[in-house]
């Protein structure tokens, strides 16, 4: 792409795309919840005994039936729990990709409270 030919509107947009768009694995809703729970667990400093999350109606609607990569499970409860119950490193929005090679079968939806 010839940057000299970009107009004044296109240049800032291209800058945003180049610097602010990051890779993500999975769908937005489960990833956002996994990222939030991972961040909370990081600041807590230990594995929480219980996870309680509050989400918007739109996130709930869009995320309840979404498959969480590497788990064979669907929904927001597994997305919220999987990072907290693992000991993997938070890698920005690739949080779920770090778990693909780990056993997540031990995470049972019976152990998860409904949102």
UniProtKB/Swiss-Prot annotation:
InterPro entries for this protein: UPF0597
Disulfide bonds: none
Coiled coil spans: none
Highest taxon in the source lineage: Bacteria
GO biological process, one term: L-cysteine catabolic process to pyruvate
Full protein name: UPF0597 protein NTHI1023
Family: Belongs to the UPF0597 family.
PANTHER family on file: UPF0597 PROTEIN YHAM
Signal sequence extent: none
An MF annotation (GO) of this entry: L-cysteine desulfhydrase activity
Species the sequence originates in: Haemophilus influenzae (strain 86-028NP)
